[in-house]
Swiss-Prot record:
Domain of life where this protein originates: Bacteria
Origin species: Cereibacter sphaeroides (strain ATCC 17025 / ATH 2.4.3) (Rhodobacter sphaeroides)
Name of the featured protein: Glucose-1-phosphate adenylyltransferase
N-terminal signal peptide: none
GO biological process: glycogen biosynthetic process
InterPro entries per UniProt: ADP-Glc_PPase, ADP_Glu_pyroP_CS, GlgC_bac, GlmU/GlgC-like_hexapep, NTP_transferase_dom, Nucleotide-diphossugar_trans, Trimer_LpxA-like_sf
EC numbers for this chain: 2.7.7.27
């Protein structure tokens, strides 16, 4: 009799994705959409990375908790992630903050988002829950993390990575012993502690938590009854488990998915204009830090039915071309030069225009003789003829959002205000 392959732990797990955050450090990019719905990489949205990791790891039961300006996110999930089938015991539920438990309460914190949906998680009939942040870019096999969680008998297993100590103020930071048991956990400390023997770096939480559902369910109910709790995983639940239970760290390097192109584990919190621009521009490198061409670990997303990109005109100074760039479908590069840039679906660049190190979100139009450098163009922006961006910092800052790193964010509202002021 042929031996049966061992059952994957992910078949007994669900992914609960926290996707309600605004991402205020992205400024006007999140005025109309939640951070997980922000575009990334030419085709995808940021949330697609967490969902694709779950899908590729073998998880077929997922829930997405939404709150801030969720319409574009919900529409994206409905269009791009509609292939789950109940008859195959597959589920993907969208859980808006609908005040379904208490008519006066939205989601009060990350833990409360799960608490308010305990009945839905119960209906999945699962043993493990993986809590995921929906706003990070990375590739990871959650099966490996689940296996460690079971082998160590932990109450919670937390995904972690090494970051420079002074960058760790935006993360939960942990101390671990030789067995990777967490002995202390500080949420977003002003002065992060370093790793013993490596004081310049800190061990930071990725916002990925693995629990046995029975344990987490009981913990959530008790937390909901605590008037002093902020009902947040990082502030309340995780520190309590570290003090009173068994919390283990899981190093991202043990489960990150890498191809021959990638030389080190890749994880990005694209939470600022500079970080968002850099992570997208990195994809144009000859050897990108993140390999989106990995067919064994695809990034699933909604794919519009559009024609291929088109390049037209071939005369001196009016040659439609793109060098070291990513150009998505339905783009027309007409007599313009694109260098080290990323164009999302449906962009148009007209004659004699020049783009260098530009991230253009869908349906951007760049009119004739525009000269753009080091900028992010929001969806639907129409760049007027002859506009120059990226060469005069004071002029850029007068009309647009100029970041600390010198990246210029351009929205249509900013362009309209400029046009009114200039008459």
């Amino acid at each position: 009799m042929k031996a049966q392959p061992p059952l994957r732990l992910t078949s007994q797990a669900m992914a609960f994705v926290l996707a309600g955050g605004r991402g205020s450090r992205l400024k006007e990019l999140t005025d109309r959409r939640a951070k997980p719905a922000v575009y990334f990489g030419g085709k995808a949205r940021i949330i697609d990375f967490a969902l694709s990791n779950a899908m590729n790891s073998g998880i077929r039961k997922m829930a997405i908790a939404t709150q801030y300006k969720a319409h574009s996110l919900i529409r994206h999930i409905q269009r791009g992630w509609n292939f789950f089938r109940e008859e195959r015991n597959e589920y993907l539920d969208i859980l808006p903050a609908s005040q379904r438990v208490d008519e006066h309460k939205w989601y009060l914190g990350t833990a409360d988002a799960v608490t308010q949906n305990i009945d839905i998680v119960d209906s999945y009939d699962i043993k493990y829950v993986i809590i995921l942040a929906g706003d990070h870019v990375y590739k990871m096999d959650y099966e490996i993390m689940l296996r460690q969680h079971c082998e160590t008998g932990a109450d919670v297993t937390i995904g972690c990575l090494t970051v420079p100590r002074m960058e760790a103020t935006a993360f939960g930071v942990m101390h671990v012993d030789a067995s990777l048991r967490i002995t202390d956990f500080l949420e977003k400390p002003a002065d992060p502690p370093g790793i013993p023997g490596d004081e310049g770096n800190a061990l930071a939480s990725m916002g990925i938590y693995v629990f046995d559902w029975a344990f987490l369910r009981d913990l959530l109910i008790r937390d909901a009854e605590d008037p002093n709790s902020s009902h947040d995983f990082g502030h309340d639940l995780i520190p309590a488990i570290v003090r009173n239970g068994k919390a283990m760290a899981h190093r991202f390097s043990d489960s990150c998915v890498m191809t021959g192109l990638e030389t080190e584990p890749y994880w990005r919190d694209v939470g600022t204009i500079d970080a968002f621009w850099q992570a997208n521009i990195d994809l144009t490198d000859f050897t990108p830090k993140l390999d989106l061409y990995d067919r064994e670990w695809p990034i699933w997303t909604y794919s519009q039915i559009v024609p291929p990109a088109k390049f037209i005109h071939d005369s001196e100074r009016r040659r439609g071309m793109a060098i070291s760039s990513l150009v998505s479908g339905d783009c027309i590069v007409s007599g313009s030069e694109i260098r080290s840039s990323l164009l999302f679906t449906g962009c148009r660049t007209h004659s004699y225009s020049s783009l260098s190190h530009v991230v253009a979100l869908p349906h951007v139009t760049v009119n004739r003789k525009a000269d753009l450098t080091n900028c992010v163009l929001d969806r639907g922006v129409v760049i007027p003829e002859g506009l120059v961006i990226g060469q005069e910092p004071e002029e850029d800052a007068r009309w647009f959002r100029r970041s600390e790193g010198g990246i210029v964010l351009v929205t249509q509202d900013m362009l309209d205000a400029r046009a009114r002021a200039l008459g």
